[in-house]
Regions:
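Flavin (FAD/FMN) cofactor-binding and adjacent substrate-gating region
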Residues: 2-14, 82-88, 112-172
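N-terminal Rossmann-like FAD-binding beta1-loop-alpha1 element of flavoenzymes
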Residues: 29-58
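Extreme N-terminal leader/targeting segments of oxidoreductases
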Residues: 1-33, 51
Length: 172
């Protein structure tokens, strides 16, 4: 069985002070929105809704931004777990483009938020590399690259990668 992200301990989790809530729930207050789950999705949703003027109540059973969010490598990129070739095949080229546009906008929002609030989180822009180890994976990488381009995300095939491992084909 594959371990879920929340089962892993991230590099940064051991060095972060425990978050203790500063506010208690005001049971007499009427909230516009109740958000269940204090991972990156819940916290981001609360942040954006509050910026829009809504009163939000964020509920988390354990610790904010731990669990699945805490166990990730925190890489943010435009290449999703489900490749654009799959999105295109199951839905359409138009839907694949819409997903790519949404993902690019999400990356921009994250980057802008980091810079706006001067968040010291090691954020940097870098490239991602997909690689193929077998002939079957090479064929799949061709499809992924073409669909990624069709979706509006630039990528290209390269001959070398920054780690000393030989692969049959790479795409960046």
């Amino acid at each position: 069985m594959i371990k879920r992200d929340g089962c892993n301990i991230s590099l940064w989790q051991e060095s972060v002070d425990e978050y203790l809530p500063t506010n208690q729930i005001d049971f007499n207050k009427i909230y516009d929105v109740v958000i269940v789950g204090g991972g990156i999705t819940g916290v981001s949703t609360a942040y954006h809704l509050q910026k829009a003027g809504m009163n939000c109540l964020l509920l988390e059973a354990h610790e904010l931004c731990f669990g699945t969010t805490g166990g990730t490598t925190a890489h943010i990129n435009t290449l999703l777990d489900v490749p654009y070739s799959t999105i295109e095949k199951k839905f359409s080229k138009e839907k694949s483009k819409l997903v790519a546009e949404s993902v690019k906008e999400a990356v921009n929002i994250i980057r802008d938020t980091v810079y706006m609030y001067n968040i010291d989180c090691g954020f940097k822009t870098t490239t991602a590399t997909l690689f193929a180890e077998t002939d079957k994976q090479k064929d799949e990488l061709d499809k992924i690259s073409a669909a990624t381009t069709d979706a509006g995300i630039k990528n290209n095939f390269i001959n070398k990668i920054s780690i000393p491992i030989k692969f049959q084909k790479q795409c960046r």
